[in-house]
Amino acid sequence: MVKICCIGAGYVGGPTMAVIALKCPSIEVAVVDISKSRIAAWNSDQLPIYEPGLDGVVKQCRGKNLFFSTDVEKHVFEADIVFVSVNTPTKTQGLGAGKAADLTYWESAARMIADVSKSDKIVVEKSTVPVKTAEAIEKILTHNSKGIKFQILSNPEFLAEGTAIKDLFNPDRVLIGGRETPEGQKAIQTLKDVYAQWVPEERILTTNLWSAELSKLAANAFLAQRISSVNAMSALCEATGANVQQVSYSVGTDSRIGPKFLNASVGFGGSCFQKDILNLVYICECNGLPEVAEYWKQVIKINDYQKSRFVNRVVASMFNTVSNKKIAILGFAFKKDTGDTRETPAIDVCQGLLGDKANLSIYDPQVTEDQIQRDLSMNKFDWDHPIHLQPTSPTTVKKVSVVWDAYEATKDAHGLCILTEWDEFKTLDYQKIFDNMQKPAFVFDGRNIVDADKLREIGFIVYSIGKPLDPWLKDMPAVA
């Protein structure tokens, strides 16, 4: 029986291994992690991550051929294939701080694999890693291997949170990169055979190691670039009276461009886009390509600009001050159908409003109060380092209350900001909300999900990103 072990029970490792276990009943899959609480959650009814469809998959396989354990060494020792799905956060200090990936967790995983292995193994990079990581890992493994042979493969994930299970069941492509030696090709074939149990052969692509590593960074950079492109257009639309939804629809009907990732918003978030682009920028700089680095940096600059532009619009619209005004924040996760708040634009928007002394009342159907308070009191890039290195009791941000209901959040508020496109926000009773808000009542729709004309009929002053401005907003001072 082939045995697979995955180090790291997070957003990537957990769902990926659960689906492999479901689709390959003859393979024994173990997901290991040093976090006792995380493994306990995977073994309970309350999984540590929210992902539609994940519950069902885990329940079908857990205890049969899918196991979650803190006994890392035992399962690595037994495995034929070891997936490494540990965090690769952005470095917060030292060489390349703020851009380079921190490979501390990766390196310690590699050293541990070398230590405990008594038989040849295939080691698979699953986390997003900088190009040439495989080479570094290979050196660590071979120098500590005591005669055991390791083959390194790169098998980047292309999951979107909120649709991870669907993406795993029916992927656009599975990418496997390996060495161009006979041993390397044999390792690629072994992993290919696992995926081939449910993925059509033509969707399994094989490349060399570097191409596979770079493809992941490039894919995320291209996606983020599309969002920044449409967000840049949204600023121009507001200035000229064009409607960004009409513009992006017209552009998206061009079959060479296509309609996906062309929704203007308050900005992109998530654990990968910014991190991967910074990483790409760093790799370009290290390879003496400053023009290329500058090009990709601009994607992040536009994203930061879009978030600060939103905050400025809120403050400018409300008579240039939000001091001690209650503002309702609807949505805190970086997108709908996930509880993930990593790099969510909501953090920067909330911090911007708090900087102007606003009182915030926040509601998100999937994010806990503890998480929101932690996010708002954290330094940049801290979120990606393990919780035990973060402040233990997050200092409660005084002017923030977290509530469990949209109507509670908006009661007596001067304005409301929609920062996540949860479906439930489309069907709220906005008349009821209007009646319970201070007047004039403002809606700042950071996701373009509400019908602005209907809200104006109720009496709201509405700002939608990239849409012709409400006459009221035109009188306000221009946004700096």
Swiss-Prot record:
Pathways involved: Nucleotide-sugar biosynthesis; UDP-alpha-D-glucuronate biosynthesis; UDP-alpha-D-glucuronate from UDP-alpha-D-glucose: step 1/1
First-level EC class: oxidoreductase
Domain of life where this protein originates: Eukaryota
Record-level Gene Ontology MF annotations: NAD binding; UDP-glucose 6-dehydrogenase activity
Active-site residues, as the UniProt record annotates them: C272 (nucleophile)
Reaction it catalyzes: UDP-alpha-D-glucose + 2 NAD(+) + H2O = UDP-alpha-D-glucuronate + 2 NADH + 3 H(+)
GO CC, any one term: nucleus
Phosphoserine, modified sites: S393
One GO BP: UDP-glucuronate biosynthetic process
Protein name: UDP-glucose 6-dehydrogenase 1
Gene giving rise to this polypeptide: UGD1
